[in-house]
């Protein structure tokens, strides 16, 4: 799960409280914070054009909405989905060490 970094101070305690209740009920679950992992969203009418420059060998125009693929972005292996929450076309790029995308 990726949470919005701007809400981390509220979301993490909320998840931890529900996790504790879940475990008390006899179910098995755990939570691990991975601060170096992250997600970058590229949204808007030029999203595919902007991202295409960073993914040689991949034809983003062939990637359908809500499709997902592992691909090399700017030299790093990433998990990319064609999705968005803005109402515009977009991509969400997940990486183990998000700083490598900058």
Regions found by a protein language model. Give the residues of each.
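Basic, glycine/lysine-rich polyanion-binding surfaces/domains
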Residues: 1-101
């Amino acid at each position: 799960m990726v949470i919005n970094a701007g809400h981390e101070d509220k979301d993490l305690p909320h998840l931890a409280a529900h996790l504790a209740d879940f475990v008390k009920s006899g179910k098995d679950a755990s939570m691990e914070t991975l601060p170096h992992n992250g997600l970058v969203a590229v949204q808007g009418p030029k999203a595919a054009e902007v991202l295409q420059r960073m993914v040689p060998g991949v034809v983003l125009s062939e990637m359908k909405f809500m499709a997902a693929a592992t691909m090399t972005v700017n030299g790093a292996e990433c998990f990319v989905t064609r999705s968005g929450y803005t109402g515009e076309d977009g991509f969400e790029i997940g990486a183990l060490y998000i700083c490598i995308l900058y």
